[in-house]
């Protein structure tokens, strides 16, 4: 140690900001640590090893806080097995400050590898120092950089996969065959605020709208009134198909419709459950306001649900793709013009 200190004195310089021997020695250690960190072969090996044998874990910032990320409050999975949707969920939970996410590397194996590469010959005077420098280089420089690279790579792959799924699902949704030549009753289901109805003719023109209350909280009287109202619209406008949105109160509405149709078998009216994702977004949009200036959002939504079965493509192109709800975390992704 005395010899090292003597040699280090030559590097002490007030002008260069090296005030004493300790600073000179620490500076030398930092230089070695940076050189180790800059070795591309080391980084490649460590990244591959971490990807193969490492894991990603997450913990709650506050375990008492309720959120949609509770399954990630105490979570760990190997890097190589982590599914894309989990990566996106972890990223979002971290961004919203519910969880802390980290990459757990096989640190002992990594340090053993680095020591073998850096320390060419065992020397009782230098080996302990070099081991400390290697550990510092990994923990302070290499490790954090590798963690960022791995998480960035996983995120890129997860987003690419999510966009592919989104595009495929959206194409299938948009290319559904239209049901032409039918007068359709659009049914936007709900509980407390009532179910909004809209009848559109074969060209998509809205003929009538109303609200019925057959779902909870309700009474037999309200259910009967709802059935009578719908039967009256079927009779008046020649409705042959009822398009029911698949949102809240869908099943309850479906049961009411099934019971009602049993009462009028001669009308041969059918019903279909329709994906209503994005209908509420559209109904509050500027485009919907211009298209239906005298309707409220519920009436616009019901009209949209009816039109979706008549011509899915023409109706769905009015909605921001991120609001259609056919992918994984699509609201978190940045889309290029051809993503869908």
Regions found by a protein language model. Give the residues of each.
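Conserved small/polar residues in nucleotide/adenosyl-binding loops
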Residues: 1-5, 335-339
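Duplex nucleic acid-engaging cores and interfaces of nucleic-acid transaction enzymes
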Residues: 3-186, 190-295, 302, 306
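Long, charge-rich intrinsically disordered scaffolds of nucleic-acid metabolism proteins
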Residues: 272, 283-337
């Amino acid at each position: 140690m005395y010899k090292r200190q003597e040699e280090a004195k030559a590097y002490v310089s007030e002008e260069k900001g090296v005030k004493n021997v300790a600073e000179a020695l620490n500076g030398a250690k930092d230089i070695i640590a940076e050189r180790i960190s800059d070795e591309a072969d080391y980084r490649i090996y460590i990244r591959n090893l971490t990807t193969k044998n490492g894991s990603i874990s997450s913990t709650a910032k506050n375990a008492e806080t309720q959120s949609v990320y509770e399954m990630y409050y105490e979570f760990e999975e190997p890097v190589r097995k982590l599914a894309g949707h989990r990566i996106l969920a972890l990223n979002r939970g971290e961004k919203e400050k519910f969880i802390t996410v980290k990459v757990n590397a096989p640190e002992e194996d990594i340090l053993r590898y680095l020591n073998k590469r850096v320390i060419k010959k065992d020397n009782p005077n230098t080996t302990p120092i070099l081991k400390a420098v290697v550990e510092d280089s990994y923990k302070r420089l290499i490790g954090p950089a590798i963690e960022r690279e791995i998480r960035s790579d996983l995120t890129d792959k997860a987003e690419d996969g999510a966009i592919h799924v989104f595009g495929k699902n959206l194409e299938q949704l948009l290319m559904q065959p239209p049901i032409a030549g039918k007068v359709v009753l659009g049914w936007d289901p709900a509980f407390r605020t009532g179910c909004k109805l809209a009848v559109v003719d074969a060209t998509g023109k809205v003929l009538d709208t109303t609200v019925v209350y057959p779902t909870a909280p309700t009474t037999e009287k309200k259910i009967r009134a709802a059935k009578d109202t719908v039967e009256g619209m079927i009779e008046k406008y020649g409705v042959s198909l009822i398009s029911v949105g698949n949102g809240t109160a869908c099943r309850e509405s479906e049961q009411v419709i099934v019971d009602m149709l049993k009462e009028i078998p001669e009308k041969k009216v059918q019903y279909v459950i329709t994906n209503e994702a994005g209908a509420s977004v559209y109904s509050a949009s500027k485009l919907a306001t211009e298209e239906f200036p005298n309707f409220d959002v519920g009436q616009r939504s019901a009209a949209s649900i009816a039109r979706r079965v008549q011509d899915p493509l023409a109706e769905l192109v009015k909605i921001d793709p991120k609001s259609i709800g056919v992918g994984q975390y699509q609201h978190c992704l940045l889309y290029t013009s051809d993503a869908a």
